[in-house]
A protein has these predicted regions:
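Phosphate-backbone recognition surface of nucleic-acid-processing proteins
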Residues: 3, 7-90
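Low-complexity, acidic/Ser/Thr- and charged residue-rich accessory regions of DNA metabolism proteins
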Residues: 40-41, 77-127
Length: 127
């Protein structure tokens, strides 16, 4: 992830300490999951698109880039699209990777830890 991406992320998010958890940043970006439902009607779940369009665009483009160039993110993308329980479509998987990047950025910026790709891929179930 380049300097321009990090600077754009920080300029759109602002002070990271005002967020209690990464889900709040996910909501700010418009990646919150909403369901279109009414009474007995169960609609599909989708992202809300409410939030900062530029932040959402930067995260999506960065997710595409890291999937193409980073082995750990490529492995996560492959897992999301090929898992037997609830496999995601291509774009859904890219959005899931973007949300994972939000969680990684949040952890790095709040706790001051460094990026560790092996930690990130530990929760993948290998069949």
């Amino acid at each position: 992830v380049g300097k321009a991406t990090v600077l754009t992320f920080l300029s759109e998010v602002g002070e990271i300490s005002r967020f209690d958890n990464p889900k709040e940043i996910q909501k700010l970006a418009g990646y919150a999951i909403v369901t279109n439902e009414s009474c007995k009607h169960q609609g599909e779940k989708r992202i809300s698109y409410r939030g900062r369009k530029r932040l959402r665009w930067v995260l999506y483009q960065t997710a595409l880039s890291v999937i193409a160039k980073n082995a750990e993110f490529r492995q996560i993308h492959a897992y999301y699209t090929t898992r037997t329980n609830n496999p995601l479509k291509g774009i859904q998987s890219v959005v899931a990777v973007a949300c994972k990047m939000i969680r990684i950025f949040y952890k790095i910026l709040t706790d001051g830890v460094s990026y560790d790709g092996t930690k990130m891929t530990q929760d993948i179930v290998h069949a």
